[in-house]
């Protein structure tokens, strides 16, 4: 399966039991910041934004004082899983990023999608990739 198919079929799909509810944007990005696949709506990000995210996985709490920035949007960092998941909130939406062995699985949402639904979609694919050694 291509990386684009993972984004299209597993991240940008309807959320179980909520037809028509889906993430606003999604991507799979290598640890080096290279985009493996993304939705058409995923924001163009700066290398330093991705560096900040990568640093937070290695040094949990790094982003807390400044917030998580992606594509010029600032998210307030909320409870995640140190070294595994970063979650951010901005207004009625937010972001979930799951780290796998080789990549970062990113999902961005707005209402009516809930934070829990975004977490489920992103982390399910991230866990699958981890099981596959990716």
Swiss-Prot record:
The record's Pfam families line, in alphabetical order, gives: Profilin (PF00235)
Q: What is this protein called?
A: Profilin-2
* Remarks, miscellaneous: The variability of the residues taking part of IgE-binding epitopes might be responsible of the difference in cross-reactivity among olive pollen cultivars, and between distantly related pollen species, leading to a variable range of allergy reactions among atopic patients.
Predominant cellular place of this UniProt entry's protein: cytoplasm
Q: What organism does this protein naturally occur in?
A: Olea europaea (Common olive)
List residues modified as Phosphothreonine. 114
Arranged from A to Z, the UniProt key words for this protein are: Actin-binding, Allergen, Cytoplasm, Cytoskeleton, Disulfide bond, Phosphoprotein
Q: Which domain of life is it from?
A: Eukaryota
What's the family? Belongs to the profilin family.
Q: Which PANTHER family match?
A: PROFILIN (PTHR11604), PROFILIN-5 (PTHR11604:SF25)
Summarizing the function annotation, the protein's role is: Binds to actin and affects the structure of the cytoskeleton. At high concentrations, profilin prevents the polymerization of actin, whereas it enhances it at low concentrations.
């Amino acid at each position: 399966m291509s990386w684009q198919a993972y984004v299209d079929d597993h991240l940008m799909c309807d959320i179980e039991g909520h037809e028509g509810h889906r993430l606003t944007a999604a991507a799979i990005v290598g640890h080096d910041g290279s985009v493996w696949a993304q939705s058409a709506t995923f924001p163009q990000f700066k290398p330093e934004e991705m560096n900040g995210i990568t640093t937070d996985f290695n040094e949990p709490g790094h982003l807390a004082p400044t917030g998580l920035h992606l594509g010029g949007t600032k998210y307030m960092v909320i409870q995640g899983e140190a070294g595994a998941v970063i979650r951010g909130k901005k207004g009625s939406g937010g972001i979930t990023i799951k780290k796998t062995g080789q990549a970062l699985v990113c999902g961005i949402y707005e209402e009516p999608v809930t934070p829990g639904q975004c977490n489920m979609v992103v982390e399910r694919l991230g866990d699958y990739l981890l099981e596959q050694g990716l």
